[in-house]
Amino acid sequence: MATVPLFTQFPCKTLNPSSSNTKHQSKSPILLPINSINRRSEIGVSVHRPDFKIRATDIDDEWGQDGVERVFASSSTVSVADKAIESVEETERLKRSLADSLYGTDRGLSVSSDTRAEISELITQLESKNPTPAPNEALFLLNGKWILAYTSFVGLFPLLSRRIEPLVKVDEISQTIDSDSFTVQNSVRFAGPFSTTSFSTNAKFEIRSPKRVQIKFEQGVIGTPQLTDSIEIPESVEVLGQKIDLNPIKGLLTSVQDTASSVARTISNQPPLKFSLPSDNTQSWLLTTYLDKDLRISRGDGGSVYVLIKEGSSLLNP
């Protein structure tokens, strides 16, 4: 433009530094050429503009990285806890369903094929949820008396298979484990019209793996018969549709009852009969596939399965 050279040639009045009046100090020129202004800004003046960075605002700004980690860790903990609670509830439901399915099966001897299949499915589901993967490392749970509730091994009950239940029935089958002495006692209690007796086998066990034990039977024990020393004598009985009055012979029956009580006390004081078991076929193994404080599932030789419930457990109550 034509005006720019004019401004650059505009005369500026300044004081001569060599003037005789040395008391006056030099002053800055009133006007500066435009090119001088430009040179000053290039050399001495710099303008700093703030840098603005745009980023997404998230939870890090408020709580920091540690806070975020704590939030996610807390959420993860809650999720794991919820799943654990659901798993426990599902296991308890399966246990109750199994106990209900076993009711009335006479430990597996009187069970339909459909019910047996249902029981097998419940057992498999529980085994998949076993809360004690290494039961032989939790011997405190194995300790105590276990009541047999079901088995697929029918040969365990030869007396019942011969159909003599009206005279003698199996009242209870149990297994008592003592991990301190590494002993197992299998016991069958029989109940008759006027007495109860038991047959037991004592064995030692060795731990072979976290789930498997080897059992060696050493001794058999026939318990002392316990006679029923209290017989309720009814006033009458009905035989083939005819009512018979027992009052005339009640005195005689009372005398028999007193004699039975005396015999019962005498027999009960006798020690049980113990005998050694032959060495043949006196060993077996047992694999525990489910274990908690109430329920135990084991598998033995030939794939037989045993369901046992801890004495005193609510699962024994239908």
UniProtKB/Swiss-Prot annotation:
Keywords: Chloroplast, Phosphoprotein, Plastid, Thylakoid, Transit peptide. InterPro entries: PAP, PAP/fibrillin_dom. GO terms for biological process: photoinhibition; response to abscisic acid; response to cold. It comes from the Eukaryota. Residues 1-55 form a transit peptide. The modification Phosphothreonine is found at T57. Belongs to the PAP/fibrillin family. This is Probable plastid-lipid-associated protein 1, chloroplastic. It comes from Arabidopsis thaliana (Mouse-ear cress).
